[in-house]
């Protein structure tokens, strides 16, 4: 009987176990379904060793680590050392075509120690013509797309660069997104998304929010444009020798007036000036300091005869002046300077010469970009900061899949980090919330600085904002300076200004040099200037020559 009574309890326990397994299985199925929807996904939950290949090239001596994000149990790929070059690559099982349908590129980065000078972008590599050798991955390895944050000096942008093969010349050309969004200035986890759509549209999202929209075929969105100009200046055309570009010329009939004195000086003595009353002619402007004494360690033989330092003569303070009075000079009313003939319109003026336009031999038309496929994913960067963490690298063919990953992998971490930061700010500044207010102001200013027509002033605005972030006690003054910059730009736009001369651009014929982002380009510019050591010895006057 006892055994029979235990049967219902056992069945109940079994039911609970089955329910737990079913619940767990449902989660696993959903995760599995998400993974199945992704073309490629790397969570870095497991060690990358053996799956991602670190470059053997000598320049890339930065150490990658499998590490937890600060404050989380979530693992990522960590840049562990400062001032190093890093290169690591993951070959895909199958190449990913970018020609048909939507393709979404997404990954997370966390700049745990900030980013002063360096890159945190990813390169989506095209198939290697000479065969794939992951251990030889470097900045020369050809890529199809480069996407992600880069910051150094005046550069502060989320790159989107694609390389496209000119079907006429056979050369690859880099096309850079114009006016890209700025890199978030905090140390939180951020997710970067690039959505390539079949209608030639590109969307750049940061933390799921659209920051930039562009069209691959638009000359307004990429530099240089994907579609070259139909004509180009004829490189063989030469300016005729008799071509006169002078709009104005000296009047050949003009004659110097007879009363024009070219030798008259610009200034003459003011004969009407008089010496002020009370001028002390016999008092020097400087006297020996009566309180000065010769240092005890002064050696006359080694250091020369000691002389007291000079101070201003106190008697001269109440007087209009001391020493010899000299008559001042004034501008010579008869001065005219060198004579030159006035300018008149040039009757032979033909305008500014330009070479004639000829058909561009490299011109082509496309209905859509002919992207190279993605065969591997690589991170090749140079950075002055450590603590950069890469995580949740995703390639998908549906932006809904990317959104799902953001919600499940990025958002929980970001929420925790944001709440922690808010609590720290409130603890540091009290309950008045000043720091939180400053953060909102900074975020707004960064967004304003991203407006395209402010691009030429962007670096100046960023410098002021970053100075305010680093010196909170000066924030108000610096914010005023930023406002002054905005106001000056506003007035310049309202009232106009001198427009720069229009310069015609020649289309690029050859592949642009492998642009690795300004981080690497700025490497040689970031060397510290050496300063001479200041002397600690007391100043000593040298022996006067007699």
From Swiss-Prot:
Q: Name one Pfam family in it.
A: Calreticulin
At which positions is Ca(2+) bound?
A: 43, 74, 391
Binding, an alpha-D-glucoside: 121, 123, 143, 150, 380
Chain positions of sequence repeats: 234-245, 251-262, 270-281, 289-300, 304-314, 323-333, 337-347, 351-361
What protein name does the entry list? Answer: Calnexin homolog
Classification of source organism: Eukaryota, Viridiplantae, Streptophyta, Embryophyta, Tracheophyta
Its membrane topology, per UniProt?
Answer: Single-pass type I membrane protein
The question of whether Calcium is a record keyword is answered with yes
Q: Which Gene Ontology BP terms does the record give?
A: ERAD pathway; protein folding
Residues on the membrane's Cytoplasmic side span: 497-546
Lumenal face of the membrane: 26-475
- Residue ranges annotated as coiled coil are none
Q: Enumerate the glycosylated residues.
A: 473
What are the GO cellular component annotations?
endoplasmic reticulum membrane
């Amino acid at each position: 009987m006892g055994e029979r009574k235990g049967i219902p309890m056992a069945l109940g326990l079994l039911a609970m176990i089955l329910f737990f397994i079913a619940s767990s299985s449902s989660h696993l199925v959903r995760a599995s379904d998400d993974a199945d929807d992704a073309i490629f996904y790397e969570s870095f939950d497991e060690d990358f060793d053996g799956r991602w290949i670190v470059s053997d090239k000598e320049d890339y001596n930065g150490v990658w680590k499998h590490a937890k994000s600060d404050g989380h149990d979530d693992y990522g790929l960590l840049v562990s050392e400062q001032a190093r070059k890093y290169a690591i690559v993951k070959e895909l099982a199958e190449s990913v075509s970018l020609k048909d349908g939507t393709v979404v590129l997404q990954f997370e980065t966390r700049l745990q120690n900030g980013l002063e000078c360096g890159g945190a972008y990813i390169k989506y590599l095209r198939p290697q013509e000479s065969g794939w050798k992951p251990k030889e991955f470097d900045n020369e390895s050809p890529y199809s797309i480069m996407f992600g944050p880069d910051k150094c000096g005046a550069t502060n942008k989320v790159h989107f660069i694609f390389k496209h093969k000119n079907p006429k010349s056979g050369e690859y050309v880099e096309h850079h997104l114009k006016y890209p969004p700025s890199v978030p200035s905090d140390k939180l986890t951020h997710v970067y998304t690039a959505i390539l759509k079949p209608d030639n549209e590109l969307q750049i999202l940061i933390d799921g929010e659209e920051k930039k929209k562009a069209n691959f075929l638009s000359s307004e969105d990429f530099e240089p444009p994907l579609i070259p100009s139909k004509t180009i200046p004829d490189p063989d055309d030469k300016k005729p020798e008799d071509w006169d570009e002078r709009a104005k010329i000296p009047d050949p009939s003009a004659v110097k007036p007879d009363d024009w004195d070219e030798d008259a000086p610009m200034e003459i003595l003011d004969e009407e000036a008089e010496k002020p009353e009370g001028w002390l002619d016999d008092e020097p402007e400087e006297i020996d300091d009566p309180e000065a004494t010769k240092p005890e360690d002064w050696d006359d033989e080694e250091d020369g005869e000691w002389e007291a330092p000079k101070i201003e003569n106190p008697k001269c303070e109440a007087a209009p002046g001391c020493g010899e009075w000299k008559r001042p000079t004034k501008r010579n009313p008869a001065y005219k300077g060198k004579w030159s003939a006035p300018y008149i319109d040039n009757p032979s003026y033909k305008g500014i010469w330009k070479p004639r336009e000829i058909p561009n031999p490299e011109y082509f038309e496309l209905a859509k970009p002919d992207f190279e496929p993605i065969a591997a994913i690589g991170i090749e960067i140079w950075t002055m900061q450590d603590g950069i963490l890469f995580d949740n690298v995703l390639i998908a063919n549906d932006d809904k899949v990317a959104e799902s990953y953001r919600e499940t992998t990025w958002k929980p971490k970001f929420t925790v980090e944001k709440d922690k930061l808010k609590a720290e700010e409130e603890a540091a500044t009290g309950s008045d919330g000043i720091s939180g207010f400053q953060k909102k102001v900074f975020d707004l200013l960064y967004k304003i600085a991203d407006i395209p027509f402010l691009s030429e002033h962007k670096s100046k605005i960023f410098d002021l904002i970053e100075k305010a972030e680093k010196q909170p006690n000066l924030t108000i003054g610096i914010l005023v300076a930023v406002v002054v910059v905005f106001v000056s730009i506003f007035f310049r736009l309202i009232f106009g200004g001198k427009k720069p001369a229009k310069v015609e651009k020649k289309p690029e014929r050859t592949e642009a040099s492998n642009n690795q982002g300004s981080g690497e380009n700025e490497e040689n510019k970031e060397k510290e200037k050496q300063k001479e050591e200041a002397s600690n010895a007391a100043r000593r006057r040298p022996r006067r020559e007699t």
